[in-house]
Amino acid sequence: MSKSWISKRESKLLYILLTTTELYLKTGQPVGSKTLKEYECSNLSTATIRNYFAELEAEGFLKKNHVSGGRIPTDLAFRYYVDHRADFLQDDLPETTIHLLNQLPKESQNIVKDLQKASELLGEALQLPTCFSSPRFENDSVTNIQLSLVDEQRVVVILSTEFGQIFTDTLWLAETSNYASLKRIETFLQNYLRKQPPSETLSQKEEDLGMTLYNEVVVRYLTRYCNFSEEDLYQTGLSKLLKYDAFKDPDMLALGLSFFESRCHMCKLLDIGMHRDRPTAFIGSELSDIFGTPNPHCAVITTPYYMNRTPLGAFGVLGPINLPYREIYKTLTIFADKVKESLTQSFYKFKLSFRRPCPSDPKLSKEPTLLARYSSIKLLPPKETS
């Protein structure tokens, strides 16, 4: 249906479609002609409404529920609804949503952690899984290191940075170790990072092991930090899908989860969303058309976030197709404005900068000078103890 010029009948057909879709979103139940008449179409007979239903069904906008006889909007109907109604922002947001949005982080140098908190608050406000993409922020530095013994010869190393990045890796120990020894090594490395003298005396073997672990994990960290081909992706809140009836079916839940957990899929959608100046919805079969996969029977809505006028990435939410699009669009619009204000202040106050992925630069991981350029951390030379 083209909106450039429509006849009176087409206008009425459009009205029936939008009203039916809106009622379905409110109730979650198939819409019958009698229900629609009582809801908002009192000037039309049920027979006339059924005729409109039949026409919309023939055009692929509605499908019949064989149990109740009511109509259910299709992916095409939801697309039409989103295009014509979703950005009507006159409705007030719930007080709980406003309260959560007011908790968004203010200006800070801990920028990645703040974006993660913002994503958590957005998910709590909308009760949906959330994700966001992020560039790499330059001049970051490691501020803490933690060691956790998996077994006698494996250790998990956790690095945390000034900007809130967390990096973990599992390393193999050439010789067996124990908890007490590993804690002494951890304290030794933490003191090194903070430029403090050692607080405990280590054996030569422990000192050598500490330097080996540190150098190994730093090289791995720098390689991943500096040589990347796509924006960083953060996801949270998958369990929120369980509250929706559409995902009570195990097969539907598996489809939604597998789609949301696909890094390739989510990165592409967030990249599309980052380059648009407003929220963007990807609905049902549109997702299968983009990726050539089975219809995941879910919807993804993205919105870009900015530093001043520069898009840094995008936030996204995933849920069933029958989402409250108007509320989500308004929430995302206000959310993005608040994030933009905070990021802009942070960038100017702390003189932050960032880099985009460089998939076309195969030399990046082979040049130590390039690796070191973007971080203040350094390798431990032999015998360095303070």
UniProtKB/Swiss-Prot annotation:
Keywords: Repressor, Stress response, Transcription, Transcription regulation. GO terms for molecular function: DNA binding. The keyword Cytoplasm does not apply. One of its GO terms (biological process) is negative regulation of DNA-templated transcription. HAMAP family: HrcA. Belongs to the HrcA family. Negative regulator of class I heat shock genes (grpE-dnaK-dnaJ and groELS operons). Prevents heat-shock induction of these operons. This is Heat-inducible transcription repressor HrcA.
